């Protein structure tokens, strides 16, 4: 992608995440990038095309560890560490690619907003979320069987609670460069949950 085209995607995607896709006009995008309408149409035929480029760029980075790696994780505590490491690596990669920090939940909200335009992205996010929930449930059951955590806890509820820890980042300003605070806060929340449930 050329530098200018990449800049259009990055600055437009930042606006889409902050204001919402429908709330952003082409004028807003022109203003953010300091380009004319003609320059936009040289690189992109529509606002939808810019959005698609941003979503594709984001999706090229997020994902989960392989099934083989997942099955080798021996404890819930270790799984939490793996999740944290993966989230930090993904966030660093996205920061380099977009020039701003993207909160995962903001991305998911954007995908939900544009699901009528791009239902395939909604399906992909739904699939990703279901897969993550399933893995949390698997690790919780394994931890119960191994005596790592309290067996009386509801597996499904605990899985949803642990999976939602990343939403604690909602109060962080989109685009913040202080990722270390975001991830230390997330790690602290995971640690507190773990202290409450371990045997």
Language model regions located:
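N-terminal positioning helix adjacent to the helix-turn-helix/winged-helix DNA-binding module
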Residues: 3-4, 8-11
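Helix-turn-helix
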Residues: 7, 15-57, 61
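Hydrophobic alpha-helical connector segments
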Residues: 53, 67-103, 155-162
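C-terminal peripheral helix-coil segments that are non-catalytic and often amphipathic
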Residues: 82-93, 134, 138-145, 164-168, ...
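Helix-loop "lid/cap" segments that line or gate small-molecule binding pockets
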Residues: 85-88, 96-99, 105-117, 192-197
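Amphipathic alpha-helical packing segments from all-alpha helical-bundle domains
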Residues: 99-103, 109, 119-146, 157
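Hydrophobic alpha-helical segments that form the core
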Residues: 103-112, 151-173, 185-192
